[in-house]
């Protein structure tokens, strides 16, 4: 069927459904709000699928259910249909003789997509499918738009994102994905709560952008006549709380970055950040390894997952490799001399078509080389450690080598999942790093951080030795659900206007 014919047919169906709704309005029963259900499909299947027909009939179990009518087969005086609720589907058996006069005729005029409430008794069909023999049924909500037909479905990716509500109705895989996402977040909370962390909320609007290298979204508070920035990270506020005595804190919330959109970047995304006093980046790596295994075991019951065709073993200890050594190990043709000196590193970057503005130092160039030449090769879980100080303005410098920091990033499936480090708690060193960031900003680096004087003041009151970490929830869900694009795991990703 051509598109124009599909549109014409859909418009005709909408018109017919509106006429049916008009009739119900005239009867005073368009949108009833007094139906109370007592059962969900999946719960009933879990308990009663195991019963044989005779045992189930003997129990005479009555249920009240509600859901969207997804299928229907009308066979004269009897019909089978499936209704779908938040947990699954249940078959219902509706007959003219089991309902009050006129109700069955009314039922036959309803449409797929309508939301109905039913009461009846559980039984098994000849094919042993758990079903409800209905003796009361009501139309609760009239659907004015038809569902996608069973042959064409809803496969257009952009339409799925724009009309996520429709995607969730017709695609069981989408419902399962976002249920899994909810489980991931719930298990993260349980994991941290059980270890004595306190969940907190910090501001979404900041007077200064900070806590990460990224371009912010700008806004304005009219009543206070004040320019503000949507937060790019909660880090500086969370560390203020550690100064205040909240020694183990975490936050799960949204971050906003005014940057490009890709399969791994959405301008609005969910981040877990957590901080612990009297801990180091080594402790954070051990905690991360435990958390990943906890999620795999509690949600999926496995220690091996498959991501984009690659089997990923979560049971083995996660190796650790410095950023410098990773460049060399994954690129045998590159020598230490090429990456240990500014000019040779710049030449190497140019060879791989990596832009290196004049204000880039050796540390920044090494990081760019790593991202271009190594990142996608990191399929199995690994911690990349000791990032250069130049790209780590909030990290504690390594005591043996001032060029690098006690920082790591966790990679799996060719993507960065987490970033953590021992925190810089020297206010004078932090102020100097902020000044270097200002120089970079003045040289054209739009992602460089601002100088946050109040944060320096907080450090001057004393931040205990602390380590912290941020984990991208969206990327973590991508990993566990085997999705290649971040938009697949965000309910309402940002899209261009039509």
From Swiss-Prot:
Query: What HAMAP family would the database entry show?
Result: Lys_tRNA_synth_class2
Q: Which family does it belong to?
A: Belongs to the class-II aminoacyl-tRNA synthetase family.
Primary location: cytoplasm
Q: What class of enzyme is it?
A: ligase
Give the residues the record marks as binding Mg(2+) 1. Answer: 409, 416
Its UniProt entry gives the catalysed reaction(s) as: tRNA(Lys) + L-lysine + ATP = L-lysyl-tRNA(Lys) + AMP + diphosphate
GO terms assigned for molecular function? ATP binding; lysine-tRNA ligase activity; magnesium ion binding; tRNA binding
Where in or outside the cell it occurs: the entry states: Cytoplasm
Cofactor(s) recorded for this entry are: Mg(2+)
Co-factor binding comment: Binds 3 Mg(2+) ions per subunit.
Tell me the protein's name: Lysine--tRNA ligase
Name its species: Coxiella burnetii (strain RSA 493 / Nine Mile phase I)
- Note whether Nucleotide-binding occurs among the keywords: yes
Q: What GO terms describe the biological role, i.e. biological process, of this protein?
A: lysyl-tRNA aminoacylation
Q: Which GO terms describe its cellular component?
A: cytoplasm; cytosol
